[in-house]
Amino acid sequence: MVNTTIKTTKSQEIFAAAQNLMPGGVSSPVRAFKSVGGQPIVFDHVKGAYIWDVDGNQYIDYVGTWGPAICGHAHPDVIGALHDALEKGTSFGAPSFLENVLAEMVIAAVPSIEMVRFVNSGTEACMAVLRLMRAFTNREKVIKFEGCYHGHADMFLVKAGSGVATLGLPDSPGVPKSATSSTLTAPYNDLEAVKALFEENRDQIAGVILEPVVGNAGFITPDAGFLEGLRELTHEHGALLVFDEVMTGFRIAYGGAQEKFGVTPDLTTLGKVIGGGLPVGAYGGRRDIMSMIAPAGPVYQAGTLSGNPLAMTAGIKTLELLQKPGAYEYLERITKKLADGLLQVALETGHAACGGHISAMFGLFFTSGPVHNYEDAKNSDTAKFGRFHRGMLERGVYLAPSQFEAGFTSLAHTDEDIDQTIAIAREVLSSI
């Protein structure tokens, strides 16, 4: 029998103090466990597929610092490279050869990227790419999809999924109508809705931006022909297609979703994996479009810590590890085993459920499904997910503390980890 009692005294004390120091006690809303209930755990250290909290409890981790830890936490090759880089300094604020190296790796891997610009976060990348889309097309309106998250910039906080969905907010106070008046929304996987928006706004739409696989409204995959249809529509209307691959980039394939599905956008945003666990973001695409970015062109974008040598170092080493033969085959195998196992256990224990995976990304909804879009996701049993999350946590499995977040595996997860996780899930689901 798995121990279901965990000591969390120190976590509770630290989090209680944090609430007097930081809004909600956290630096990002989903970490506060608002949608799953209970107290968040406070981490002490991580290694491989595991995390340890300040009370000494160990967990199998399927959050992976929200995506970057695809090789496992604190991989010795990454840590070793970072140690050497630290000896040279933590920040230059000037060009470094490391930027060239990582840029070449990204350009070689991602089909759409001919030039790339490094920034500090996925939010920054999406903000910059929106400005670039508008400048290149000389149009203002942009189509995004309900439940797709592109960071917390004002213009994207419209049916944005992720933390906004977790907190039950339709958008955010403080966002002026003028900031979102040019942001059009459509249901994910609904080509007809996109066609209608193009017809209603002829010659006004700069482009379409989306998560090619949605990971911020749970895990939702594109229907057959959806991405191809968007590519055709944007070509037809002289608009740009942007894939936000902050989550899917280098995770569902080395070349991201665009490699996986064979659809090449005009621009791409990246983050997470390309920083190896350090703060990073990037955007890139066709040379003629990227050449508009300052100082090569008139579209301004800058950052004090952009191209940080430590982030570049961790990114380079992470991509080198992912280039090793068999890496993605391994990720596919263990993630399929996990996703299939969780779904089977849920159904066998009498719960309505659906889910799936692509490579090292997976999800489980407590609804009979299928889940094609944000509205479908919102109809899932989030209260049951909260009980499931708490039960798994108490038995040593750390899942994302929200129904509206995808799960992640890594090269560090073993078959034994997966078997143990499925066994624990059976125990939990049999009790709720």
UniProtKB/Swiss-Prot annotation:
Keyword field: Chlorophyll biosynthesis, Cytoplasm, Isomerase, Porphyrin biosynthesis, Pyridoxal phosphate
Coiled-coil zones: none
Cofactor requirements of the protein: pyridoxal 5'-phosphate
CC annotations in GO: cytoplasm
Top-level division of the source organism's lineage: Bacteria
Record field: catalytic activity: (S)-4-amino-5-oxopentanoate = 5-aminolevulinate
Main location: cytoplasm
Alphabetized NCBIfam families for the sequence: hemL, PRK00062.1
Stated name of the protein: Glutamate-1-semialdehyde 2,1-aminomutase
Organism: Nostoc sp. (strain PCC 7120 / SAG 25.82 / UTEX 2576)
